[in-house]
UniProtKB/Swiss-Prot annotation:
Residues 1331-1343 have a biased composition (Acidic residues). GO terms for molecular function: chromatin binding; DNA binding; DNA-binding transcription factor activity, RNA polymerase II-specific; RNA polymerase II cis-regulatory region sequence-specific DNA binding; RNA polymerase II transcription regulatory region sequence-specific DNA binding; sequence-specific DNA binding. Pfam families: CUT (PF02376), CUX1_N (PF25398), Homeodomain (PF00046). PANTHER family: CCAAT DISPLACEMENT PROTEIN-RELATED (PTHR14043), HOMEOBOX PROTEIN CUT-LIKE 1 (PTHR14043:SF4). GO terms for cellular component: cytoplasm; neuron projection; nucleus. Asn-1285 may participate in regulating DNA-binding activity by promoting homo- and heterodimerization. Keywords: Coiled coil, Developmental protein, DNA-binding, Homeobox, Isopeptide bond, Nucleus, Phosphoprotein, Repeat, Repressor, Transcription, Transcription regulation, Ubl conjugation. This is Homeobox protein cut-like 1. The modification Phosphoserine is found at residues 427, 761, 904, 1054, 1064, 1265, 1332, 1468, 1496, 1506. It comes from Mus musculus.
């Protein structure tokens, strides 16, 4: 440190030395200059001045000298010090040496201490060493001791080992002896076991032989019983035939008798007395003959009954025997099982096998001659086969014998029958008829019964009524009948070919439903060769039960064919299998093995096999696919799809039912002739050997003749169907009656039989599905039927159809309810608009729905169908086009209302088919979006959990989410969210919804679903679905829906009596949303929290603390509640305080009285409730927790009474309209749960230039977009809510002027004649008046892009509103006409706006949809007589008489105002309802969204109300 300081000091000293040297030089220089200057001064200055200055200069000189002397001395001193310091030697090396010495001294100290320690340790070690020396001696002694111990141990161990060895040897000898003993005992036991085994084997053989005997006996008995039953049945059939013949004869005799009676009466009138005797004689002879016939009939009936009784006895006996045999069999089986269990593991069958082989070689090889095959068959099988062949021979001989003896026996009995007028020869039963439902009347006029057909319905339905009951014939009856007829044909062959019948009778248990052997198919190849019948697939399934189908192979082949010919699975499923695309995809992708399929599950594979068997099927299907691709929009396409849809259960062969629309009568005739050939072949194969050739030729001639007659009828029917199609004139009622018999006779049972009775009753068509196509007056449908019918028509079915026709005709006359859209030729452009949607919708609808085109006007159609049909039609009236469609709100109130088409107020407007709402369509995902998620693993469970949370948090229902984001139905969404599949198990299509969910969570998709935050305007809603959704979610659950403000209720001063208000209000109760529900007792709606949109944005609960959270969030976060306890407490509070459930429901829960009553009476447990279902209980709990709950409800009740009295008073004092409304109750007092919001809202007054600007904007765009509204607001320095309200009020005023004029015109009796549908279509009830812009910011629901789309109320074409020029023309009077004060006391108009005279608007503007009214109170300062009230007072039932808002009522009485009086202006007084101010609540987006939804409902109700004839309104 010192050396550093010294070096520093040296440097400083050096610097100062150099500075001093420099200063010395400088001072010398300056001194010289001073001397020179003084010299010059002496020279230049005058002397007197020098004298004056001399002393001063001298003193300066002296001072300078002294200073210089001082400085020199100082410098000298410094230099001496400096020299000395320079001479001092460098101290650094000395310091280093000192430091080293210090270190050495330190080390010395350390070494001394260490030495001391070492000395100490050395002393210790020395001591230890001494001790160790002493221990060595002891160690040696110890070692010696150890050696001794070891020696002793060794000796002990040896002795112990010897002892043990001895012991073990003894044990071994003993065990060996025992082992020998056990061996002896086991050998003896083994011998016993072998002996037992032999005895058991012999017992087993015995039981097997017994079992075999039992089986053979059982088979013999079953075959014998089958033979007996068959004989009984043949007797029964013959008896039936005779009975029928007798009945026919009896009928002819009765007719003769009646005709004779008639003639005798006539004769008696002419000649009374002389002919009495003859008359008596003739009558007596006829009566005698009739009595004989009746006796014969009675005898035949007795025979039939006796045969039936014997048959039932036989059945019972056989059943009891079978059960006994089965019991025996079970017993034997159980013993057999026990024996087998004993034999397991011990049996040795080699010897038995040898014996069997020798037996086979000895017994069966020569007799059967089967060669190598028999060697593989077991002995039992060979014995069974032998026995079976013997039994079958025995059975055939017995049948032929009984046949011969039976015919011989009957010859004597049937002798009188041969003398009858028309004896029927006992011809053999016919072959299986083409149409299973027809009566087999061409040979013996009765059904054929066979053992295979003895089903449960044998006696009940078929025997009791020989003609099949059409409407109730189910699949089972058909199936059994078909099998009966099949078996009958087989038996008839069996009778002829006794030798070849060995395979017909199965020796297995007797089955009623199936033929176990497939051989009948081989024997009668014509069975499958016939044209398709509706039940052929079922019969094929039952016949070919035995044959197994390789399902995987068939599915593979079908897929190959579909891919090869580019046929879609939907088309294939629709036309071939009768299944949906999803089912087809499932069957083809994962075909189940044949043995795991049910009978119904096997059907599609039979159909697919049939489909693959013929190339024509594939080509026909390909042509259909091509046609559908070429013109998918054709409306008629659906008609051709529908007919096969009803028959698509038939089978895989589709060529017979797929017909192009162009095919004409030539093809029909061709197909008929082909069918005739097939019939002939069938008859030839079925013809027994005994029948003569002449009879068969006669039959075939008859068949061909009937077929050709049928063809002629078909062509006539086609012509008749085509004629009306060429011109729009409808088919009249007579035409229908001409056409329907032909069609019905053509296919009496062609489609009925496909459906079971339940399905037929569910379809809303009378008697049978095919009647719809036959009876519909539609050209394409008739044409289609005409082409399809020949393929399904057997000869002789026309007679059978007559019975079907009568009930159908009566049904048609009564009025049947068709669910087909009415295709109107008047509006082709509309059809083009909707056809693509309809075809889409139709593909998803059930195949049972009938649709056909119709050129018939509504009135005639309604005459045909009657009131029930029209009522049905109005139920089925969904309007897919209008976002404000009223269809979903319409409620049928009976035929008395004028809502059916024939008495609708729009006689001239054509009925246009409204498509069912199309499936929710969402824009497809981009390839980029697919690629991001498709190949990465997504946790579906976590994803669905997040989605559910987000949906619950934002209060979005699953239906909206499904429609807007996923493009799925609510059910699919619910299923997906509750049970998500793992990502790895999903197909590409199955992954798409999850990708969409992920994109939605990330904010890349479907943002229109979420409520928009922070916007002044609520979201623009574009579809009915999105508008209606919040209703279904809980009817604006987070809005104070039930507390409908003044804009939702009739004005308190409206001139209505209470009884009339009851009419309108009771109808409102039927509204789907409680938002617009009012009391049934004529009270006004609950105005609590007057428009709660301002005072309480989120819930109608009277709790200010919860305003931050929406009710959905409260429900989602609430713990499990005791629903029973809550309801019990609520009921107690209500009853104790005498509060009604209606008031509580509307004010607190937002529900109707009925819903509240249901909730309180039958509360569900919390865990079984959905989020929506939990909401009322959360509201109840919050209400119960509120200390002021009862007081608030009591206040509401009191105010309701006051308002009711006020209304009655105002209805009485209608003639003084200028009574100031300031005396009205301020509904915010006590009604609002937040008592701090009690200030009335100030009136907004617009300047004239602001009004002019807004009017100009209105003329350009009456429904401005949110962007336009914001621009206007910023330009005019107004609030956006003010601009929105101004537009809304202005539109309402213009519409009201038109409305009042129309009412006035109607009151003069001219409305009915002049009013056009378009002018009446979209008229709305008036809304708030004037330019007052206070109130809640309403949300105008606009079409996208700001287009003004108007929808006609009857579903006509959407029109764009009229051009601005027309609008300008319409609105000019509004600016020119002067306001007239209502009475002398009314102050002038503050805002200075002119009233407008009523003037009709252009049609386009009239048709524009009504604006969405705000939820605000009516404009402040309105006069009650013209003050606008909510359009909600209009009810949803279109035909209902309704008491409208005040404008309508005030304009109606002709005494109060002249017909063309200008509309009266509102006064400047405050409105009846004060609006509380709430700054914070204003921007709540949830409130706005709910308000928008409410407004849309109100708008739809306006439309529904304005559709009616004004003249029909009752006041």
């Amino acid at each position: 440190m010192l050396c550093v300081a010294g070096a520093k000091l040296k440097r400083e000293l050096d610097a100062t030395a150099t500075v001093l040297a420099n200063r010395q030089d400088e001072s010398e220089q300056s001194r010289k200059r001073l001397i020179e200057q003084s010299r010059e001064f002496k020279k230049n200055t005058p002397e007197d001045l020098r004298k004056q200055v001399a002393p001063l200069l001298k003193s300066f000189q002296g001072e300078i000298d002294a200073l210089s002397k001082r400085s020199k001395e100082a410098e000298a001193a410094f230099l001496t010090v400096y020299k000395r310091l320079i001479d001092v030697p460098d101290p650094v090396p000395a310091l280093d040496v000192g430091q080293q010495l210090e270190i050495k001294v330190q080390r010395l100290h350390d070494i001394e201490t260490e030495n001391q320690k070492l000395r100490e340790t050395l002393e210790e070690y020395n001591k230890e060493f001494a001790e160790v020396k002493n221990q060595e001696v002891t160690i040696k002694a110890l070692k010696e001791k150890i050696r001794e111990y070891e020696q002793t141990l060794k000796s002990q161990a040896e002795t112990i080992a010897l002892e043990k060895e001895q012991k073990l040897q003894n044990d071994f000898a003993e065990k060996e002896r025992k082992l020998q003993e056990t061996q002896m005992s086991t050998t003896s036991k083994l011998e016993e076991a072998e002996h037992k085994l032999q005895t058991l084997q012999t017992a087993l053989e015995k039981t097997r032989t017994e079992l075999f005997d039992l089986k053979t006996k059982y088979d013999e008995e079953t075959t014998a019983k089958a033979d007996e039953i068959e004989m009984i049945m043949t007797d029964l059939e013959r008896a039936n035939q005779r009975a029928e013949v007798a009945q026919r004869e009896a009928e002819t005799l009765r007719e003769q008798l009646s005709s004779a009676n008639h003639s005798l009466q006539l004769a008696s009138q002419i000649q009374k007395a002389p002919d009495v005797a003859i008359e008596v004689l003739t009558r007596s002879s006829l009566e005698v003959e009739l009595a004989a016939k009746e006796r014969e009939i009675a005898q035949l009936v007795e025979d039939v009954q006796r045969l039936q009784a014997s048959l039932t006895k036989l059945r019972e006996n056989s059943a009891s025997q079978i059960s006994q045999l089965e019991q025996q069999l079970n017993a034997k089986n159980s013993t057999l099982k026990q024996l087998e269990e004993k034999l397991k593991g011990q049996a040795d069958y080699e010897e038995v096998k040898k014996e069997l082989n020798t037996l086979k070689s000895m017994e069966f090889a020569p007799s059967e001659g089967a060669g190598t095959q028999d060697s593989t068959k077991p002995l039992e099988v060979l014995l069974l086969e032998k026995n079976r062949s013997l039994q079958s021979e025995n059975a055939t001989l017995r049948i032929s014998n009984s046949d011969l003896s039976g015919s011989a026996r009957r010859k004597g009995r049937d002798q009188p029958e041969s003398r009858r007028p028309g004896p029927l020869p006992a011809s053999p039963p016919p072959q299986l008829p083409r149409n299973t439902g027809e009566q087999v009347s061409n040979t013996n006029g009765t059904h054929h019964f066979s053992p295979a057909g003895l089903s449960q319905d044998f006696f009940s339905s078929n025997l009791a009524s020989p003609s099949l009951p059409l409407a109730s014939t189910g699949k089972f009856a058909l199936n059994s009948l078909l099998q009966r007829q099949l078996m009958q044909s087989f038996y008839s062959k069996a009778m002829q070919e006794a030798g070849s019948t060995s395979t017909i009778f199965s020796t297995g248990p007797y089955s009623t439903n199936s033929i176990s052997s497939p051989s009948p198919l081989q024997q009668s190849p014509d069975v499958n060769g016939m044209a398709p019948s509706p039940s052929q697939s079922e019969s094929a399934g039952s016949i070919s039960e035995g044959e197994e189908i390789d399902t995987a192979e068939i599915a593979r082949q079908v897929k190959e064919q579909l891919i090869k010919h580019n046929i879609g699975q939907r088309i294939f499923g629709h036309y071939v299998l009768g299944l949906s695309q999803g089912s087809v995809s499932e069957i083809l992708a994962r075909p189940k093995p044949w043995n795991k399929l049910t009978v119904r599950g096997k059907e599609p594979f039979h159909k697919m096999k049939q489909f693959l068997s013929d190339e024509q099927n594939i080509l026909a299907l390909r042509s259909i696919q091509g046609r559908q691709r070429e013109n998918p929009g054709q409306s008629l396409n659906r008609l051709f799809q529908e007919v096969p849809k009803r028959r698509n259960r038939s089978e895989g062969n589709i060529t017979t039912r797929i017909r192009a629309s162009e095919t004409g009568s030539d093809e029909a005739i061709k197909s008929i002739l082909e069918q005739a050939k097939r019939e002939l072949q069938v008859q030839k194969t079925a013809e027994p050997v005994q029948t003569s050739s002449t009879s068969s030729s006669g039959n075939s001639d008859d068949a061909i003749r009937s077929i050709l007659q049928q063809a002629r009828r078909e062509m006539e029917a086609q012509q008749a169907a085509l004629d009306p199609a060429l011109k729009p004139a409808p088919l009249s009622q007579p035409d229908l009656t001409i056409l329907t018999p032909k069609h019905l006779s053509a296919s009496p049972m062609s489609t009925v039989s496909t459906y079971p009775p339940l399905a037929i009753s569910l379809k809303k068509t009378p008697a049978a599905p095919e009647t719809s196509t036959a009876a519909l007056p539609s050209a394409p449908a008739l044409k289609k039927e005409a082409q399809d019918v020949p393929t399904l028509d057997p000869p002789g079915s026309a007679d059978a159809a007559q019975g079907v026709l009568r009930p159908m005709k009566s049904e048609l006359v009564r009025g049947s309810t068709w669910k087909d859209p009415w295709w109107s030729p008047i509006q082709p452009e509309r059809r083009n608009l909707t056809s693509s949607e309809e075809t889409k919708a139709d593909e998803t609808t059930a195949s049972g729905k009938e649709r056909a085109g119709s050129s018939q006007p509504r009135a005639e159609r309604s005459q045909l169908q009657g009131p029930s049909a029209s009522a049905e039609y109005w139920k089925e009236w969904p309007s897919a086009e209008s976002p404000y469609s009223q269809s979903s709100e319409l409620s049928l109130t009976g035929a008395s209302r004028s809502e059916t088409p024939q008495n609708s107020p729009l006689p001239s407007s054509p009925i246009v088919p409204m498509a069912k709402p199309a499936k929710p369509s969402v824009p497809p995902l981009t390839p980029e979006q697919y690629e991001v998620y498709m190949y990465q693993e997504v946790d579906t469970i976590e994803l669905t959990r997040q989605v559910k949370e987000k949906l619950a948090k934002n209060g979005i229902c699953q239906r909206i989410f499904g429609e807007k984001v996923l493009g799925l139905s609510q059910g699919s969404v619910s299923d997906m969210l509750s049970r998500p599949k793992p990502w790895s198990k999903l197909t590409q299509k199955g992954r798409e919804p999850f990708i969409r969910m992920q994109l939605w969570l990330n904010g890349e998709l479907g943002q229109g679903v979420l409520p928009v935050q922070g916007q002044q305007q609520g979201p623009v809603l574009h579809s009915v679905a999105s508008l209606q959704d919040p209703l279904q979610q809980g009817c604006v659950s987070s809005e104070s829906t039930p507390k409908t403000s003044a804009s939702c209720s009739p004005a308190p001063e409206s001139p209505m009596s209470s009884s009339e208000s009851v009419k309108s209000l009771t109808e409102l109760v039927q509204q789907p949303c409680p938002a617009i529900e009012t009391s049934k007792e004529g009270k006004p709606p609950e105005p609590s929290d007057p428009p709660a949109s301002d005072s309480q944005p989120t819930t109608p609960l009277p709790l200010s603390g919860h305003s931050a959270l929406s009710i959905q969030e409260l429900v989602a976060m609430s713990p499990e509640l005791d629903t029973y306890g809550i309801t019990k407490r609520v009921k107690e509070v209500l009853t104790d305080n005498n509060l009604g459930q209606r008031l509580f429901g509307e004010t607190i829960l937002g529900l109707t009285q009925g819903s509240v009553s249901d909730l309180l009476a039958r509360p569900k447990p919390w865990h079984k409730l959905s989020l929506k279902g939990r909401e009322p209980f959360v509201r109840m709990q919050l209400w119960l927790n509120d200390p002021n709950n009862v007081e608030k409800l009591m206040d509401m009740k009191r105010m309701e009474k006051k308002a009711y009295m006020k209304r009655r008073h105002s209805s009485v004092s209608d003639s003084q309209p200028c009574e100031p409304p300031s005396v009205g109750i301020d509904y915010s007092q006590g009604a609002s749960p937040q008592p701090q919001h009690q200030l009335k809202k100030p009136r907004v007054v617009l300047a004239p230039e602001e009004k002019e600007a807004l009017k100009r904007a209105y003329q350009q765009k009456p429904y401005p977009s949110p962007k336009t509204i914001e621009e206007l607001a910023t330009q005019l320095n107004l609030k956006t809510s003010t601009v929105i309200n101004w537009f809304h009020n202005y539109r309402s005023r213009i519409r009201r002027e038109l409305f009042i004029e129309e009412i006035q015109a109607g009151s003069q009796g001219q409305a009915g004649a002049s009013d056009s549908p378009s002018a009446r279509s979209s008229r709305a009830a008036p809304s708030s008046e004037g330019d007052s812009c206070d109130g809640v910011e309403a949300t105008d629901a606009e079409e996208p892009g700001g287009n003004i789309v108007a929808t006609k109320s009857q579903g006509g074409l959407a029109e764009v509103a009229a051009a601005p020029a027309d609008r300008e023309e319409a609105t000019q009077p509004a600016e020119k006409a002067k306001a007239q004060p209502l009475c002398s006391g009314t102050p002038g108009q503050d805002d200075g706006e002119d009233a407008s005279r009523p003037r009709p608007l252009p049609e386009g503007l009239a048709d524009a949809p009504a604006p969405v009214p705000s939820l605000a109170a009516p404009a402040a300062g309105e006069d009650a007589a013209t003050s606008a009230t909510a359009p909600a007072t209009a009810t949803e039932a279109p035909g209902a008489a309704r008491a409208g808002p005040a404008e309508r009522s005030s304009a109606l009485p002709s005494t109060s105002a002249p017909a063309n009086a200008p509309a009266r202006r509102p006064s400047s007084l405050q409105s009846l309802f004060g609006l509380p101010e709430a700054a914070g609540a204003r921007d709540n987006p949830v409130r706005k969204k709910k308000a928008a939804n409410l407004n849309s409902i109100i708008h739809r109700l306006e439309k529904a109300a304005s559709r009616e004839e004004p003249i029909e309104w009752e006041f």
